[in-house]
Amino acid sequence: MTRTLEKVLSRNLIHLGQRIFLFLLMVDQIPEHLVSAAVLVIWMFQFMLEKPLYLSQLENRFIMATENDKSSNEIEKEATTPSPLTPVPKPTTEDKRWGLNGRLAFAIAAAALGSSFQHGYNTGVVNAPQQLIENWISDLKMNRTGQVTKQSEVTMIWAIAVSIFCVGGMIGGSLVGSIADRFGRKGGLLLNNILVLLTVIFEGCAKAAKSYEMIIIGRFLIGINAGLNAGLAPMYLSEISPIHLRGAVGTVYQLVITMSILVSQILGLEQILGTDDQWPLLLCLTIVPAIFQVVTLPLCPESPKYLLLSKGKDMEAQRALAWLRGTIEVHDEMEEMRTEYESVKLVPKVTLKELFVNPSLRIPLMIAIMVMFAQQLSGINAVMFFSTKIFTMAQLDKTAAQNATMAVGAMNVVMTFVSLILVEKAGRKTLLLAGFSGMFIDTALLAICLAFADTSRAAAYSSIVLVMTFVILFATGPGSIPWFLVSELFNQSARPAATSVAIAVNWTANFIVSIGFLPLQEALGAYVFIIFAALQAFFVFFIYKKVPETKNKTMEEISSMFRQISYQ
């Protein structure tokens, strides 16, 4: 029945794409490059939904390659005994090098580049062409009404277009659990790209159709996409990673976000795509990572933990794990998953209500919620918003200030990469404490320096240094760890529901900051950063008291720890 429904859905979606293509051909005003892009996108989703023959052949070749590595005795034993082979000793530190191989790296790239790139790119892409799009909206409204458009009206429309991205993120985040359970982590990521297609159609055709409402709809749809990606991608990355690489692989999600924000800043320059004619193309480039993911992710297996713990497919989970590890010596990991599977079978599927009622689940849920609040209420968005103004205060001209802002973005990328290395050495809790403690001191000093920046060159230059330092501190832990920490705190049965709550909270906090920062900044000036400093001090105390260290711990060990705490 399920396969029949999937075939009907695939057929209907392909027919919908063909009708959209015919519509684009009939509308003369639509630029040719958008029609060409539509052809490519429709083929892309036909590729994803119909699963061409050569893709199946490639998958079979991967499976056969794994099977050929087995000896005849192993194959005979596997055929007669579905249970695992005798566990081998746990790998030593020297043996752990096999954990990262070409196939695992390929799966990480397919999942992260196609998902978190959407998140970061669409966060930053609207900044550079803001004035161009506002002018277009103003002219459009004047043509509609025959009256000069008030700047306040244009500002309101633009604010809605920007902030509705967060509203979409809240909705997408709340859907993570149901999508992850229904379609799987990999399947959910692939289907999520349909929203990217719709976004490109709306945003790419908005100027030709003379409708700023299409920009708002597109931003809303890509917000839902980003919200789903923020839950599904870290979940998939966490579940396919060896235990000793789980933190490093989880950090990749934030690393790609910082990279994509930097890419959006560069492409938005006036010398590249930041022009009246090219800004629709700038918005439409979000389709590129979607195409990459739709082509590459089908070659990767579904999460082994999802296959075994959620679907009970032992052999498929073992094949997927062998593919990801590049070796058939996966019996130890399979034993750990089977142990978790036996414990999961003893309890019913975790509901949203159960998360708040069960003490052993409520404690990690509160931790997950607080670290998500901490990330967004740390003041990073406010500092990034203020960065260009701070550089201008230091008497840098407009071009130099823009270049300095991009340098901050580049530093964010570099330091997030550094955190990818540190997270498995220093641990999650240590990096969170170091990051938020340093940010507390930095933010308090930044508020003081900004208050005197207009009259003191020394204060203005000190502000630049403090902004750079703030970004470094944020990138070393608070920026990346919350995304994957949620997946580490919960077992398989509770993870989808808990991730839905945590991601929805993250986007809600993001929305609160985006809406509330400007009014507070107008009322308090530079002293608005004192609020962020106070919040950071609270988060340091909370992390020190409540957040456990999850480095190198299995899911069963973490769950057992929370059960013991709940009984105390």
Q: In which residue ranges do the predicted regions lie?
A:
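Alpha-helical transmembrane bundle of multi-pass membrane proteins
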Residues: 2-6, 13, 21, 27, ...
